[in-house]
């Protein structure tokens, strides 16, 4: 045990005690224009690369939410292609551009993401730019009987790829939301009651060029919740809980039922060109989960 008072050396001496050493007198240049630029030195580096960049970048953003906007925290992946005769890209330009957009009051929309990806490619002097942005989207949910409201959230994402040589852009959007599912088999064979579980519905859709006015977050949310046994709620009083319990019993769903019903809704949405749907149920009477998936391309039919 240490004894008090303790006589301490200066902070500089303490750092030396624990291994700090003074900087050496270097011989390499400290001015940027005199430094060797390894990334841009031309040479045959064997292969061109599809994507080079940074991921897991946390940043505050403002998103478009219907007729309003919403502030949230997003996770970015930013990348560009890389030609064969360049060793790498200047990655600092990626976060530099993100900070520039943020300081200019950027509102995230499908159109502004396409412009962002195009500018990434141009800054890097590459032909392709890509980005993925993920964030929690918050929305208000009212209880079914009392009308009491609270906030819900869904995980959403947008992925953009732009080719500056062909001027082509692809855009896909996705959403994951939790729902209630009640087992049809349990309801059918039991004298009373039925087991239910929390289902995780994940949807991803490729959008057509004419999808500018498509409120994709709300449409995907509705596709999942309207086909579930019951949606989730942040606030439920006893009259609400009774309503939700009975609603689930009236609408039993297997995971297979969920993905087929959601697929039917997405198929009817003209702005969607192709889609992926997955439902995963955390089973209450098993240790394992139940899953079902479907991938469908309307243009390939």
Swiss-Prot record:
<dbReference type="GO" id="GO:0003934">
    <property type="term" value="F:GTP cyclohydrolase I activity"/>
</dbReference>
<dbReference type="InterPro" id="IPR022838">
    <property type="entry name" value="GTP_cyclohydrolase_FolE2"/>
</dbReference>
<protein>
    <recommendedName>
        <fullName>GTP cyclohydrolase FolE2</fullName>
        <ecNumber>3.5.4.16</ecNumber>
    </recommendedName>
</protein>
<comment type="pathway">
    <text>Cofactor biosynthesis; 7,8-dihydroneopterin triphosphate biosynthesis; 7,8-dihydroneopterin triphosphate from GTP: step 1/1.</text>
</comment>
<feature type="site" description="May be catalytically important">
    <location>
        <position position="183"/>
    </location>
</feature>
<keyword id="KW-0378">Hydrolase</keyword>
<dbReference type="GO" id="GO:0046654">
    <property type="term" value="P:tetrahydrofolate biosynthetic process"/>
</dbReference>
<comment type="function">
    <text>Converts GTP to 7,8-dihydroneopterin triphosphate.</text>
</comment>
<dbReference type="Pfam" id="PF02649">
    <property type="entry name" value="GCHY-1"/>
</dbReference>
<comment type="similarity">
    <text>Belongs to the GTP cyclohydrolase IV family.</text>
</comment>
<dbReference type="InterPro" id="IPR003801">
    <property type="entry name" value="GTP_cyclohydrolase_FolE2/MptA"/>
</dbReference>
